[in-house]
Amino acid sequence: MTKKRVVVTGLGALSPLGNDVDTSWNNAINGVSGIGPITRVDAEEYPAKVAAELKDFNVEDYMDKKEARKMDRFTQYAVVAAKMAVEDADLNITDEIAPRVGVWVGSGIGGLETLESQFEIFLTKGPRRVSPFFVPMMIPDMATGQISIALGAKGVNSCTVTACATGTNSIGDAFKVIQRGDADVMVTGGTEAPLTRMSFAGFSANKALSTNPDPKTASRPFDKNRDGFVMGEGAGIIVLEELEHALARGAKIYGEIVGYGSTGDAYHITAPAQDGEGGARAMQEAIKDAGIAPEEIDYINAHGTSTYYNDKYETMAIKTVFGEHAHKLAVSSTKSMTGHLLGAAGGIEAIFSILAIKEGVIPPTINIQTPDEECDLDYVPDEARRQELNYVLSNSLGFGGHNATLIFKKYQS
């Protein structure tokens, strides 16, 4: 069976770099950091002092207050970004096409803020005072459910939860839905709102977060002095569309998605497999799925979390897959500016990968001040680079040994 071609026709984002795609992208290519002092929780209680928060976001600017109160923050972000993406795609979801329009949006954690607040009510006021909206606000699939309701999309409706690989897995899974003919359009990506007391406590306890108090330099992927990731929030949603469907309605096309790889480490609950073996296989699977040679990849948007082992092993994985070509590749981590959006990271980074192809600009890795001999690739330090790109690869790796890779291509008719 001939695989259907799948293109990207819409983008929507809420990120620490901006409350829309254009602002987020322009800040990324200008090396602007979206990281600042923690305001959502009392920083005095935690070793980590900085976070990548949304700025000046008021959900009532985007939806009715009554509806917003029925959603956890992660769902609010997803619905807002999805509406942006569909509007950008100029897609009118009529009753006729609704059964062929699906939603596949994931969250690595779900409604942790709701869980914390309702558990406090449970403890202090008793079980009868817990909100009837507690469960439907908390569960991770509710972002997809609320997007489906908001858009009137009645096709495939699913949710992936693979920790920090969630956004990338979601897009890859949605890509395959269209490729095999089960939908014409998929609204897909990732969302996360993890800036809560328990989340900071948990990630601090396992030593994952940077304790650098300087917001400008705390997230420093591939730098010798990196000491952990900076937690962030937001949503990145894209519209995937079967090519003929997009052409028939005259849609603008940002680029094409051509490859997806997904593997498991079977190694450790939080640490990546030694030498990046699982990540290497995910990249190899995606390259095979795309039907291209490794040497055709021009740029890698790395997972690049600013943790010691991730950056070391991802570098090793890239060398395993690409051999000599690894040193000719441009590799950058936009997490140096956005922080780590966990389940939303893959969605935002897919958008940056797509725009890198469309605009011919590679966003930089900022804060590489002290080179690490174990991280010796071209990480596009400090300044964006103009370069024609035909194929871009994006990696996401998650707790539990989840590895996911997407490959995007410059669209050619």
From Swiss-Prot:
It catalyses: a fatty acyl-[ACP] + malonyl-[ACP] + H(+) = a 3-oxoacyl-[ACP] + holo-[ACP] + CO2; (9Z)-hexadecenoyl-[ACP] + malonyl-[ACP] + H(+) = 3-oxo-(11Z)-octadecenoyl-[ACP] + holo-[ACP] + CO2. GO terms for biological process: fatty acid biosynthetic process. It holds the Pfam family Ketoacyl-synt_C. The active site is at C164, H303, H340. The keyword Disulfide bond does not apply. Disulfide bonds: none annotated. Its EC number is 2.3.1.179. Pathway: Lipid metabolism; fatty acid biosynthesis. The keyword Lipid metabolism applies. It comes from the Bacteria. Inhibited by cerulenin. One of its GO terms (cellular component) is cytosol. Belongs to the thiolase-like superfamily. Beta-ketoacyl-ACP synthases family. This is 3-oxoacyl-[acyl-carrier-protein] synthase 2.
